[in-house]
């Protein structure tokens, strides 16, 4: 055998050392993989819990909205019940022959006031523009245009009152409007 320098021949110790380092790297990698898998499982669990909580919140909000819609009219209806009671009492009284026509008229006026108060409590406002008010197509509906001694495009007369609720038109006021001269 020719003489070869000892540096060129791998020693058994070097091979064992390299094998040990590789084994350590594999062990470290396996530990890191196990750690990351555990962290991944924790994050997946946290995600599922957060998603379930969000779904529950969304479902509760939808239920609340449905209940609000269902019972939104409750307060309004409750304020109208005394008006209904008054009208029924008037019918019973009239059927029994009680009360003069003046008393009936007085009762109708009282019931109308009661209805007005119920509407006001529920923020239903009348649209009853006085003559000469500028025509507003958002709150008024022109039924006819008539010649008049007032400025053009102004209200001459109200044929039927309109109503607003929370700045939204429930029904426009039916009006006649002054024609251009």
From Swiss-Prot:
Predominant localisation class: cytoplasm
Location(s) in or outside the cell: Cytoplasm
Gene Ontology MF annotations: adenyl-nucleotide exchange factor activity; protein homodimerization activity; protein-folding chaperone binding; unfolded protein binding
GO biological process annotation, one example: protein folding
InterPro entries registered for this protein in UniProt: GrpE (IPR000740), GrpE_coiled_coil (IPR013805), GrpE_head (IPR009012)
Domain of life: Bacteria
CDD domains hit by this protein: GrpE
Record-level GO cellular component terms: cytosol
Keywords, ordered alphabetically: Chaperone, Cytoplasm, Stress response
Gene3D superfamilies assigned to the protein according to its UniProt record, in alphabetical order: 3.90.20.20, Head domain of nucleotide exchange factor GrpE (2.30.22.10)
Parts forming coiled coils: none
Pfam families attached to this UniProt entry: GrpE (PF01025)
NCBIfam families, per database record: PRK14139.1, PRK14140.1
PANTHER family (UniProt xref): GRPE PROTEIN, GRPE PROTEIN HOMOLOG, MITOCHONDRIAL
Function as written in the Swiss-Prot or TrEMBL entry: Participates actively in the response to hyperosmotic and heat shock by preventing the aggregation of stress-denatured proteins, in association with DnaK and GrpE. It is the nucleotide exchange factor for DnaK and may function as a thermosensor. Unfolded proteins bind initially to DnaJ; upon interaction with the DnaJ-bound protein, DnaK hydrolyzes its bound ATP, resulting in the formation of a stable complex. GrpE releases ADP from DnaK; ATP binding to DnaK triggers the release of the substrate protein, thus completing the reaction cycle.
Subunit structure: Homodimer.
Protein family membership: Belongs to the GrpE family.
Name assigned to this protein: Protein GrpE
